[in-house]
Amino acid sequence: MEKRRAVVSVIGKDQVGIIAGVTKILADHYINILDIRQTILQDFFTMMMVVDVTDIENLDGLQKQFDELGGAIGQQINIQREEIFQTMHRI
C-alpha cells in the first residue's frame, strides 16, 4: 500500500508546549511523523511536519482538534494532504 502523506503547519508566538500539544494529537491517532522542521525567528514560532496519514480517511476531525489547540495556545495550525499543499504552493 502506498503511503498517503499530509503537511502540518504551525505559526504563532513562541511559547512552551507547542510541539508537545501538536505531537500529542498526532500520537493519539497513531500518526507517524516522517519529517519535521521548526524555527524560531525572534518571538515567532514556525513548524512544518510531513506525516503519514495512510490510515486516516478524513482530516476534518484532526483539523478540528488542531483548531481547538491553536485557539487555546495562540497558534495557527493546519493539516492538508500533501498533494493539496503542493498544488497551493506551486510557483
Where in the sequence are the language-model features?
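A conserved regulatory-domain signal marking ACT and ACT-like small-molecule sensing domains
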Residues: 1-91
